[in-house]
């Protein structure tokens, strides 16, 4: 295969600017699938992706395009990427396997927060960026304004940018020409050098075992080759290899410059790490390819199976998901209230949501999640720094000097009409104003420094509602800062409930604790004695609600008669309730925790 006829590219864009639809049209245009096989979002393989209309997993396909200009067949390797801020890691991995990127911009929405961050990722990987203006068939499309925005904010020349409608398939041929003319072929790849293949993704197949998606940088790999993973020196014999078109197509050999998949009967999921380099065991490469910087989770939460008998199944399921999503981290934990569970680290709230939904759908495991938390740094009295991801791990107040929390630089692009609302929201969430610049005549980009914990605490939903859905957010972690943070414990009848302990800012502690207490009061069933629900910081009670006792009518058998008789019965009841309260345990049904934690 001549290298000059190969093009490796990905499609990047903000959410809803039409990446997956454009991928569909490109696949259609190359006649890779028959009309019967085509369906919308063909590259989004998970049901969740189709339902939510978002891309979560990157996906790589090989397309053959016959160019009428020079009468040649070109091999396009298209890698579809997610657009949501939580899945930036997926984008960076797919870009490392390409030479170019199509930057899709919506002709009515223009440049948005995620558009910019994806451009920076592409520039970091030295990719050739081809701007594409999409949705030109919309009545609200303003092509000239969007072209000027791209030129001003990103610095890309848009004079020859393809103007397309991915929905109707208008001008898709312009994109094909731009891919051939502007994206460079992988000429630095050499079939004769020792094998170097970058693993940019992996998934689990019930029959083939763990399957690696690879970009062959140098050399070639055949069925029967003994391959070696350079990070752990484990060796395997290749049992099958090929490409996706999006159908799985088996081949005998993959050569330098190609993007495909390799199966080698790998049973242990942990043998594969994304970003690793595969080489030939008989003729190994001396150096591995530069992989990816390991991304660290931003949000932690405990996941517990509602049915405790499913715990072992849950562990297996999480291992399988981990294979295709190496940004997930997990460790085993137990809770008095919820039993055995796993504490997981996620890239953001959407990532957490998606993993929970995948566990529910693909493995039929219903889960309960504790309140999400970020990583705090605790400066101990002896000067060492302890990193904690849950309130349960916070040491006693006497053992540390201060708590630091992560701050994020949040860039919000918002129409002028909603600027006041957005700035007020940021102030309410402990935001610190940094910058305000014009994006165009009707929109501003405002930059705030906001604690990551606040972004996790319903900030995104509030941002959408206060801007009627028009504001877009992009954030990155900047640094850790000392804050007045406290641990709030919830007591039921004087007993601490570990699953409900949280770390929060002192300023918001009483208000948020009151909400938790009220929620508990709604859901806890009545007992024979009254139950105090208290939120405490150390020994100080900052919020309290009471679940009143069930009252048995002890006077029912007294018809008239002496009042002292009635008083005596009421006194006896009062004494009994007092005794019960001292020795009685509050039994909180498991589904009460499910309700409380799912509402939080």
Swiss-Prot record:
It catalyses: GTP + H2O = GDP + phosphate + H(+). GTP binds at residues 16-21, 134-137. Residues 4-187 form the tr-type G domain. InterPro entries: EF-4 (IPR006297), EFG_III/V (IPR035647), EFG_V-like (IPR000640), EFTu-like_2 (IPR004161), G_TR_CS (IPR031157), LepA_C_sf (IPR038363), LepA_CTD (IPR013842), LepA_IV (IPR035654). It is a peripheral membrane protein. It comes from the Bacteria. CDD domains: EF4_II, EF4_III, LepA, lepA_C. Required for accurate and efficient protein synthesis under certain stress conditions. May act as a fidelity factor of the translation reaction, by catalyzing a one-codon backward translocation of tRNAs on improperly translocated ribosomes. Back-translocation proceeds from a post-translocation (POST) complex to a pre-translocation (PRE) complex, thus giving elongation factor G a second chance to translocate the tRNAs correctly. Binds to ribosomes in a GTP-dependent manner. HAMAP family: LepA. Belongs to the TRAFAC class translation factor GTPase superfamily. Classic translation factor GTPase family. LepA subfamily. This is Elongation factor 4. It comes from Malacoplasma penetrans (strain HF-2). The lineage of its organism: Bacteria, Bacillati, Mycoplasmatota, Mycoplasmoidales, Mycoplasmoidaceae. The gene is lepA.
